[in-house]
Amino acid sequence: MKYLKTFIAIIILFALLPTASFASEKSNGNNEDVYAQRMELYKTIETVTMVPWYYIAAVDQYERNIRGIRRDLPKPESISGVYFEPMKWSGPLNPNQDDNNPMSIALFNGVGIDGNGDGKASRTDDFDVLLTMAKYLQSYGSDDDNLKIGLWNYYKRDKTVSIIVEIAKLYNHFGRLDLMAHSFPVPLRSRHSYRNTWGDARGWGGRRIHEGTDIFADYGVPVMATCYGVVEMKGWNRYGGWRVGIRDINNTYHYYAHLSGFAKDLKVGQIVVPGTVIGGVGSSGYGPPGTSGKFPPHLHYGMYKDNGYTEWSFDPYPHLRLWERQMRNKR
């Protein structure tokens, strides 16, 4: 009976949305068109399942992110980013791993659902895929705590759950999906210099490589967030001194180290935008809390990518050059 009610609700929604286009083919439009199509999908599925659209969007964005960098997953080719392995979609004992028949999929305990009422449960149909994911989450509840439980049971990884929750927090706060803008981490008018130092050798505390770019500037020059994100970490590290970590919607962790101090009232969990002041350039680090002055003042800026299994450093220098150039061109 509950499946019948869901099916009827979907049919009614399609009748009320005569211009809706939930096709799974690649969009030929610009980014604004893609964002609009995704938002339409998320809002429609929210109406059917009562799962908040920003959680659906966050899961979709997270999976799109990891599919873009993982070699063991196919690259996303449609509006949605969620991916189900054939065995999970069709059922582990289903002899037809490309099955799109809802009845046989259900018979073999597959998760695939016919979301748009075309008689097929297709892994390449955006609405089918997103509704399947949303229905899974709905089985745990639609409030924050139960959705977190559902996410953990699906991904079995605390870090993944926290990233998805942070992305959902950003989407909910801003009410939109286009949160890709960036800015340079120090004021353009400041005296600053930097070169590509990612991968250079470092000796203090043992042999290691430099996982970032050093931007030299005067002591106390404001340090700003480079992205839309959530403050994930704030505190002391014997290498980085006073430092801040911010996570954006692309699973990228932005690391700001050797600060002279933090912006007033900056706290973990806070939402920031490009240009939000988070601290000042300093020379803290290389010792116990409060150690400072062992090197010239500079900002150590690092970027780390999470792929669903682990997190690794990548070169931020090209991004810094791009953001600096973009900001200068806007002046």
Regions found by a protein language model. Give the residues of each.
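Catalytic glycan-binding domains that act on GlcNAc-containing polysaccharides
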Residues: 25-175
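Acidic, glycine-rich catalytic/binding loops that coordinate metals and/or anionic ligands
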Residues: 182, 294-331
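Active-site loop architecture of trypsin-fold serine endopeptidases
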Residues: 205, 281-298
